[in-house]
From Swiss-Prot:
Species this chain originates from: Caenorhabditis elegans
Keywords assigned: Cell membrane, Cytoplasmic vesicle, Hydrolase, Lipoprotein, Membrane, Palmitate
Gene Ontology MF term list: palmitoyl-(protein) hydrolase activity
Entry GO terms, CC: cytoplasm; cytoplasmic vesicle; endosome membrane; plasma membrane; sensory dendrite
Location in or out of the cell: Cell membrane; Cytoplasmic vesicle membrane
List of catalytic residues: 191 (charge relay system), 256 (charge relay system), 285 (charge relay system)
Protein name, as recorded: Alpha/beta hydrolase domain-containing protein aho-3
Effect annotated for changing residue 34 to S: No defect in starvation-induced thermotaxis plasticity. Impaired starvation-induced thermotaxis plasticity and loss of localization to neuronal sensory endings
Length: 332
């Protein structure tokens, strides 16, 4: 293996979403669900109790913006690579006055795109750094990521409102501090990370969007078969994705035990700029990236489809993949 390559010939599983408690959201007790969704006027704060599971911080940040992993909580297996040479840390502040920890990972020189990665609900940046380095190496992309409020070295408490403020602050830092223009930023959201990714993509014109195991909304995860977005619903990505204007790749395992496969299909169908999706037969919520098709599809998406599709007019009823208009006047 050439110098600087991540250890191993394939991607290791992300620690992004460890097995959920009691079998995941679909097996939460009726009492828990009543407490979760039927206690206005603060449904979003109640949702947070089940949606967010921040671990004990796995890292610290030095005064000169270096990442220090805490032994026993996170590891850097790439022995041939000096982490200090390719990983930079920053702290930014959100509009809700929380401090958010961010990392810029540069596995290779002269990468064209930067992934803005939003991780799962039970990890922090320290635990994700090794995976993000490997992902960037295999895709020839820089990777910029951040911790949600209440995770890692970020202050505050995790909540839906903070999710949106966190990604906005990270996005602004990526542009201002690192000089990355919008047209070279690819959003990548995994699991709960698809929620802020869809929100930002619905407001900004970016290079592309990757949605890995997305959810339609909180109510639809907790109550399978729900077809209406209620006023108390949290994380309503299904209502925002029709406003996305950049090429969008949806990835989902057909046997996902946490966020049902139907969520990925519905997000794909509602997005006016979705490209050929990656449905991984037999994959669950935590092992999609172990399949060879994962990296293959991401490479082709980034090399051939990122920045290629643009919606020319707002989509008012994007319910079918046959109702998409793209900039060259063709349909897909």
């Amino acid at each position: 293996m050439s110098s600087g390559a991540p250890s191993g010939s394939s991607m290791s599983s992300t620690p992004g979403s460890p097995p959920p408690r009691a079998g995941g959201p679909n097996s939460v007790s009726f009492k828990d669900l009543c407490c979760l969704f039927c206690c206005p006027p603060f449904p979003s704060s109640i949702v947070s109790k089940l949606a967010f599971m921040p671990p004990e911080p796995s890292y610290t940040i030095t005064e000169d913006n270096k990442l220090v992993l805490i032994e026993g909580r996170a590891a850097w297996p790439h022995q041939e690579v000096d982490m200090a040479n390719c990983v930079e840390m920053r702290i930014t502040r959100t509009r809700r006055r929380n401090r958010v920890a961010c990392t810029m990972i540069r596995p290779l020189p002269n990468s064209h795109f930067t992934l803005l990665f939003s991780h799962g609900n039970a990890v922090d940046l320290g635990q994700m750094t090794s995976f993000l380095y490997g992902l960037g190496f295999h895709l020839n992309c820089n990777v910029f990521s951040y911790d949600y409020s209440g995770y890692g070295c970020s202050t505050g408490k995790p909540s839906e409102k903070n999710l949106y403020a966190d990604i906005t602050a990270a996005f602004e830092l990526l542009k201002s501090e690192f000089g990355v223009p919008k047209e070279k930023i690819i959003l990548y959201g995994q699991s709960i990370g698809t929620v802020p990714s869809v929100d930002l993509a619905s407001r900004e014109d970016l290079a592309a969007l990757v949605l890995h195991s997305p959810l339609m909304s909180g109510m639809r995860v907790a109550f399978p078969g729900t077809t209406t977005t209620w006023c108390c619903d949290a994380f309503p990505s299904i209502e925002k994705v029709p406003r996305v204007k950049c090429p969008t790749l949806v990835i989902h395992g057909t046997d996902d035990e946490v966020i049902d496969f139907s969520h990925g299909v519905s997000i794909y169908e509602r997005c006016p700029t979705s490209v050929e999706p990656l449905w991984v037969p037999g994959a669950g919520h935590n092992d999609v990236e172990l399949h060879a098709a994962y990296l293959e599809r991401l490479r082709s998406f980034i090399d051939m489809e990122a920045s290629a599709i643009r919606v020319t007019a707002p989509i008012t009823n994007a319910t079918s993949t046959n109702s998409r208009t793209i900039s060259n006047g063709t349909s897909s």
